[in-house]
Amino acid sequence: MAEAVAQPVETVAHTFAPKLFNKWSYDVTVSDISLKELLAINSKLKYQVFLPHTAGRYQIKPFRKIQCPIVERLVCCMMQHGKNSGKKLLAMRVVEESFEIIHLLTEKNPIQVLVDAIINASPREDSTRVGTGGNAKRQAVDVSPLRRINQALYLMTMGCRSAAFRNSKTLAECLADEIVNASKSNTASFAIKKKEDMERVAKSNR
């Protein structure tokens, strides 16, 4: 019988790589340089989790939510609003099922597809009101990288919820369709349509 060979602790720690839901690797690339440090995927080992539930208190300081793994942020967005609020286990099951569907549709790593969808669905330009009262007017402004991620997640989850309402498709199927379409910059995606509307309005207010 062969004897077990002990490995140094450093070697074991270096080779250890968790997988999301014990299936999907975190070995993904972020093509947008401005979002690379804010997506919290593989820049640090603590972002690579088996389950998207870290029980972190990300609300106690501004900008602390950039330390929240991006898949967990998607799960938290799925808990909005109404009857799904607070049901994180349900939201995690929906995201896991949608990732399975994404893998079947694209034969790619679902985390990579999600990252591409966030990059494509995040608006780069928006408009805001400048002035007070009767002198107020709309002014085009650049969108910060953190708000780009927030907007992309919000628009994708809002689109899949509205698509699943009074529809034979499940919420997981609608979420998978939304993410796949957004990753391809397809206008069938609710988030892509909203992003283009926002950028068109901003362009007219330059």
From Swiss-Prot:
Annotated compartments: Cytoplasm
GO molecular function: mRNA binding; rRNA binding; structural constituent of ribosome
CDD domains tied to this protein: uS7_Eukaryote
GO biological process terms held by the UniProt record: ribosomal small subunit assembly; translation
GO cellular component terms, A-Z: cytosolic small ribosomal subunit; ribosome
Alphabetized InterPro entries for the sequence: Ribosomal_uS7 (IPR000235), Ribosomal_uS7_CS (IPR020606), Ribosomal_uS7_dom (IPR023798), Ribosomal_uS7_dom_sf (IPR036823), Ribosomal_uS7_euk/arc (IPR005716)
Any Pfam family matching the protein: Ribosomal_S7
Top-level taxon: Eukaryota
UniProt entry keywords in alphabetical sequence: Cytoplasm, Ribonucleoprotein, Ribosomal protein
Self-association state and partner proteins as the record states: Component of the small ribosomal subunit.
Role noted for this protein: Component of the small ribosomal subunit. The ribosome is a large ribonucleoprotein complex responsible for the synthesis of proteins in the cell.
Family the entry assigns: Belongs to the universal ribosomal protein uS7 family.
Protein name: Small ribosomal subunit protein uS7
Origin species: Entamoeba histolytica (strain ATCC 30459 / HM-1:IMSS / ABRM)
Highest classification ranks of the organism: Eukaryota, Amoebozoa, Evosea, Archamoebae, Mastigamoebida
